[in-house]
């Protein structure tokens, strides 16, 4: 295993740990296991022996063959060999990533502070001596004799390594994929200073290589580095015979993976190609959900708790992080980790299925303008249910507790003898989030001089907790079991009903309820009354409940298609203090033109100054002035193209579209220009003449748009008016 460290003297050092020998397990008849052991020994350096490990579902010991692999590079291949050799045998721990497995075994994690005992080769330490071949280079590196962690995964006050950071991007709009056509010069930022590289004096790859050698960054943060920047620089360097030291590691090539389209819960999504480095870290801000949502501070937090490699953690889902946290606990408990999900759904009568296959409880909102409204939320409700009631895939309908308490509505049993793996994982995450919340309350939410951004760290942990519920029912989750998913939903429904009944018994009116939130109103109620209600609900349900906010007013909006029908998640709330809460409006949607989103937010800022319906009506006139100003800007041609960009996700390949929708037209324009598009990719376009008889004149892909085409003033004005309509919807009917 190759390790890269920053020493106390700031030296960067490459080390090899040859003591790491991962193992996997095989279950089957004794005679077959004996033959398998002989076959494995004939293929590779392995040590085989019978041992006992715990089965996740039975909770009992299982006799298995332990296969210890002397060369980690053969680990995955030997697991595949077992499949080919005897497909009836069951494998465990055989397809785990080696880096987390190393961390589990050595009790370390990425970015941790460690203490090492190192053996140095006779010709010196890394970097590798010039002129050495690859085989010699491997031996020339210092070897780890012992490693000990001097850090704690669950610490909140931790020190991060002093990483040297370089940022790279192309000139132009960051959100527009440069592969769609328009590419500017390469911009590189080091220590706050930006440099521009183009081909005017030397190849861009040559200039970038020089900066890499001069500044030797530990971390490169890019925009579109995975799919465009680094592949393009590598191609240019290869054609020109240039050496481009993207990697620090002298014996490893840059790792690439292909882009792919896939389906998830009925949505067509796209995962871009990746370019990962060895000896350096590369994070592509356009290809990292967690870096986009929580910046690098949130990414470092996830890396520490999941023990996933930094570059992998940046690009994978938070669900993978939860899975590896579950697997680490299983590993430490001596529990076998199934290679793939092996627990099928239990057979159910149709009546049972109808009862079980339901989500959270929703009480539709009362339409209208309401003053003096409070929002009460169960804190991390689904994770709290898992932790409080021990709901985990292996604990639901266990075989050891026939008299265990039953899940309401469903009658499922929950184990009383062993603590569930998922329950323990979420319990630790909840506790750490609470610690960060306490630190925020003591020192303020915003980071100060030398103080970490606890808000971003807490947000990163939230994303882990958000997905842990879904993974209990995910069809491919190793520790997934649909009955656990159904149990959590059933308990959540029961707790929300208890909360509703408690509120109504105390004279509060329920305006809206959604899974884990209640919007309540009571004439003359003060903040203390709502806090007491939350405490009463918490006492009755056993789940933590918080007063999220007291709102001066809330506007619950109907369906866009049917003005009399309420819909969940289309409303806006103005609190006594803090930010306006918005759901379902255009300014919350990723595909809305920036001009429209900005108009809505400006109008809301004015409306948020109102305290009741009468003052809201007065402020509405001021908000209309905002709308008129934006309409006039469009009319005068004063809107910039960046403000008018509309983004859409492709649901199919460009040539498979049958109808001339705006998305189809723009996609086909890009396709004809030579851009290769795949289902799930995002494209951007400008509306140029929505009513034209010629489809190509209706919209123009952003990277193909020319200034002389202009934009469709009438259509964009129509969109602005539609976006303003929610604010006027109840203006004539009055408050409730």
Locate the predicted segments by residue.
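DnaQ-like (DEDDh/DEDDy) 3′-5′ exonuclease domain used for proofreading
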Residues: 1-215, 238-245, 295-297, 304-359, ...
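Gly-rich Lys/Arg/Thr-decorated short loops/hinges at beta-loop-alpha junctions or inter-strand turns
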Residues: 188-193, 471-490
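A short acidic (Asp/Glu
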Residues: 178, 223-236, 385-386, 521-524, ...
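DNA-dependent DNA polymerase catalytic subunits
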Residues: 3-5, 309-393, 397-398, 449-453, ...
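Metal-dependent phosphoesterase core characteristic of DEDDh/y 3'-5' exonuclease domains
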Residues: 183, 190-191, 219-316, 323, ...
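Short glycine-rich phosphate-binding loop at a beta-alpha junction
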Residues: 217-226, 511-512, 519
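Core alpha/beta catalytic barrel or barrel-like domain that forms the active/cofactor pocket
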Residues: 469-476, 508-517
